[in-house]
Structures are given as C-alpha cells and as structure tokens.
Amino acid sequence: TGEKPYSCSDCGKCFTRRWNLSEHRKSHTGQKRFCCSVCGKGFSYHSQMKSHYRTHTGEKPCICSECGKSFTDHAGLRIHQKYHTGVKPFSCSECGKCFTRRSGLTAHLRIHTGEKPYTCTECGKCFTCRTDLARHLRIHTENKPFTCSQCEKSFASHSDLDRHHCLP
C-alpha cells in the first residue's frame, strides 16, 4: 500500500517495517562499525561502506535506463531517477524552492536561517552541511583518497577526480 507507519523520532524519516526503523536508528548513535580499507572513513552500515569503497575503485554498476548515467549504489540511482520524473515533493516554506530529497530541503533551509552546525576543529570555520566540512578537513590532513586509475594522481574530493582529464 506504500504506507510507512514507522517514523524516526530523531529525523522524521519513515519506514514500512519496524526492523528498517530499528536499523536506521543506529545511524543516529554516531557509532561507525564499518571502516573503508583505503581511507579509513567510518560508516554505520556495511552497504554505505561498500558504496563508498566504489568511489576509490571508480566502479559504478547501477546504470540509469533513461540517460545512461551510472552510480555506485541503487539508492543513488533511485534518487537520480526522480529527476527524470520531475517529482520534487519537498518544498521550502520560505521561498518555494522544491527538492527531490528531504535532506536537500533541510540543507537549503540553512540558507534562510544562517545556521552552520558543522565546525572545523582545526580552524573554526563553519559549514551548513557535513559533506562540506568533510571536504574542508582534507585541507588540514592532506588526505587525498581519490586516485586516478590512469596516472595515480590523487585528489581530495571525488569531484576533483571527475574534473581531472588524464590522457592515457
């Protein structure tokens, strides 16, 4: 029926099964039970770690039948496919901008509130989202976990690797 009666009291995400909610709740504990063997990044779920690991290998086995774009996991593909349908169920009450994902709306709302809840412990710079802080932290650590398979040059972010054009 599509009904999702089980909702997370921390973030509001809803689930069809109690077990899925129980598994999801583990993500709020902060415990990272699975670590990437390449860069050491921790994850709450094995599936997250496996998907992340593919960013190092470049493997993107999930392919969109509409446009051919590929993804490291099925979740990324499902989110992408919403762009083809044009469905954006999450809208900003301030400006009306709509989003495919709830997390997109949550991050967007911080533009209006000015909230920057993620702070760098090295320099004090603040960020609106966790991924921006994680990318920034690599400046301090010189961690460059994304390596070109052609020339072995390393990059601090996956987007920097994608922009890199190596001629074999």
UniProtKB/Swiss-Prot annotation:
Keywords: DNA-binding, Metal-binding, Nucleus, Repeat, Transcription, Transcription regulation, Zinc, Zinc-finger
InterPro entries recorded: Znf-C2H2_11, Znf_C2H2_sf, Znf_C2H2_type
SMART domains assigned: ZnF_C2H2
Recorded coiled-coil stretches: none
Cell compartment(s), UniProt: Nucleus
ZnF endpoints (C2H2-type): 6-28, 34-56, 62-84, 90-112, 118-140, 146-165
Domain of life: Eukaryota
Gene Ontology biological process terms, A to Z: regulation of transcription by RNA polymerase II
Gene Ontology MF, one: zinc ion binding
GO CC list: nucleus
Chain's role: May be involved in transcriptional regulation.
Protein name in UniProt: Gastrula zinc finger protein XlCGF42.1
Originating organism: Xenopus laevis
